[in-house]
């Protein structure tokens, strides 16, 4: 086998491979002999059919199959020989191989970029420092009360925090439009669910009032036929309601699975959950800054094949969130996912290089600690831990999480780290989706 390597644009490479004719003919003959030996032919005992007859019947198809297998096998031998690391499947050039002639073909593919990490000591990380205090717990308790609130009709004007039940009919240039009409529509004032100006027009109105308001649909409104249009709404207020919060008592506490200890036990449970959430938020914020810095300091070429693979993953995840239809996933435009897919690939390649350069391996104690920490969110942590320990795939997933965290720790160790005191709410509101 003869091999030459061409460097094309960017990460693209082309192998020119020549396979001696004898290798091809030997493989074709071996396959024809196998057919003659194992298939039945009319008029011949099994295994006694002439090879020339088999070649006449199956020779062309066998040759094509052999060429495909030979190209794949010799491509693998070539990349091993040349120490090349492909980032995706090769494209074999169309080839014709005449009997008795050498097989000459090309394989075009992308390779992984050569990554040389730099600038790790220039990465800046601001570590948030905070704690869950009593006022944070009280605020969370109030949030829980609001979630359990009921609504009661009041003889008061509509304002932020109250809920109204309204009938409305919308029109544009005197014509009603689809989706612009409703009866007994519940609207929580101040929630910002409606287009700009709609809630403002209702504020101050009381039960039984009928009136009209003029509004404009935003230019980026989801319905194409309504974008930027001026509309008039005829509205009737059927009732105004105020939120009634439940009493903070044992009955309220029992709704959250706290059987004993009353309000103080609920507060303790809420604090524990908030502290767990806080710990994860701090970890996420540090990780986010470390990865952002790593990407900013290390610009690399990205194989298109890897981006394509990641787009497929993101498409499938999107389809699962909306019913799991694979056909629908295929129809989603790649532009929706391209930027995120490229970011994921870049981060994966750079973290992979950190792991390689630091010679990191998943630490068993860290894996165990991660599983135990995750299990505390469940009613029976021991059952969750046992499930992981008995499931090798789940354990491998957790080992990957541990390895990524160890890579982040390695980046942090070389970065410029400072501390900043923030509140619980401020930290949680800063969170962004992980890369």
UniProtKB/Swiss-Prot annotation:
PPIase FKBP-type domain span: 161-246
Disulfide-linked positions: none
Source domain of life: Bacteria
Any one biological process term the GO annotation gives: protein transport
Main localisation: cytoplasm
GO cellular component term, pick one: cytoplasm
Residue stretches in coiled coil: none
Catalyzed reactions per annotation: [protein]-peptidylproline (omega=180) = [protein]-peptidylproline (omega=0)
EC number(s) reported in the record: 5.2.1.8
One of the record's GO molecular function terms: ribosome binding
Keyword Disulfide bond: no
Subcellular location: Cytoplasm
Pfam family, one: Trigger_N
Keyword Transferase attributed: no
Enzyme class: isomerase
Keywords: Cell cycle, Cell division, Chaperone, Cytoplasm, Isomerase, Rotamase
PANTHER family: TRIGGER FACTOR CHAPERONE AND PEPTIDYL-PROLYL CIS/TRANS ISOMERASE (PTHR30560), TRIGGER FACTOR-LIKE PROTEIN TIG, CHLOROPLASTIC (PTHR30560:SF3)
Family statement: Belongs to the FKBP-type PPIase family. Tig subfamily.
Purpose of the protein: Involved in protein export. Acts as a chaperone by maintaining the newly synthesized protein in an open conformation. Functions as a peptidyl-prolyl cis-trans isomerase.
Domain notes: Consists of 3 domains; the N-terminus binds the ribosome, the middle domain has PPIase activity, while the C-terminus has intrinsic chaperone activity on its own.
Protein name, per record: Trigger factor
Provenance organism: Vibrio campbellii (strain ATCC BAA-1116)
Gene responsible for this protein: tig
């Amino acid at each position: 086998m003869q091999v030459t390597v061409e460097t094309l644009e960017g990460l693209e490479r082309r192998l020119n491979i020549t396979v001696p004719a004898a290798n091809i003919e030997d493989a074709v003959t071996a396959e024809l002999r196998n057919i003659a030996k194992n298939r039945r032919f009319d008029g011949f005992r099994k295994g006694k059919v002439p090879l020339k007859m088999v070649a006449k019947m199956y020779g062309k198809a066998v040759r094509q199959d052999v060429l495909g297998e030979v190209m794949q096998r010799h491509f693998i031998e070539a990349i091993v020989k040349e120490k090349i690391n492909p980032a995706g499947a090769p494209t074999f050039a169309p080839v014709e191989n005449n009997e008795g002639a050498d097989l000459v073909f090309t394989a075009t593919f992308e390779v992984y970029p050569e990554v040389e990490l730099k600038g790790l000591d220039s990465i800046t990380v601001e570590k948030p420092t905070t704690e869950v205090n009593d006022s944070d717990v009280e605020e969370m308790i109030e949030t829980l009360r609001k979630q359990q609130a009921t609504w009661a009709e009041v003889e008061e004007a509509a304002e932020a925090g109250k809920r109204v039940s309204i009938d409305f009919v919308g029109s544009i240039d005197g014509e009603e439009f689809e989706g612009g009409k409703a009866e007994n529509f519940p609207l929580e004032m101040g929630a910002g669910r409606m287009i700009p100006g709609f809630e403002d027009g209702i504020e101050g109105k009381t039960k039984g009032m009928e009136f009209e308001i003029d509004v404009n649909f935003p230019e980026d409104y989801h319905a194409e036929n309504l974008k930027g249009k001026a509309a008039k709404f005829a509205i009737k207020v059927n009732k105004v309601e105020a939120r009634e919060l439940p009493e903070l008592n044992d009955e309220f506490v029992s709704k959250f699975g706290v059987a004993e200890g009353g309000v103080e036990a609920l507060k303790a449970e809420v604090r524990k959950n908030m502290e767990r959430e806080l710990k994860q938020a701090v970890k996420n914020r540090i990780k986010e800054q470390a990865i952002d810095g790593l990407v900013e300091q290390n610009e690399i070429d990205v194989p298109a094949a890897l981006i394509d693979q990641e787009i497929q993953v993101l498409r499938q995840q999107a389809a699962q969130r909306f019913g799991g239809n694979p056909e629908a996933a295929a129809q989603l435009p790649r532009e929706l996912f391209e930027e995120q897919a490229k970011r994921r690939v870049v981060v994966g390649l750079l973290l992979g290089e950190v792991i390689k350069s630091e010679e990191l391996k998943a630490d068993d104690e860290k894996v165990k600690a991660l599983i135990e920490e995750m299990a505390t969110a469940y009613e029976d942590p021991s059952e969750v831990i046992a499930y992981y320990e008995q499931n090798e795939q789940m354990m491998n997933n957790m080992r990957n999480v541990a390895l990524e965290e160890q890579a982040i720790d390695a980046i942090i160790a070389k970065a410029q780290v400072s501390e900043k005191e923030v509140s619980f709410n401020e930290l949680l509101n800063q969170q962004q989706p992980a890369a």
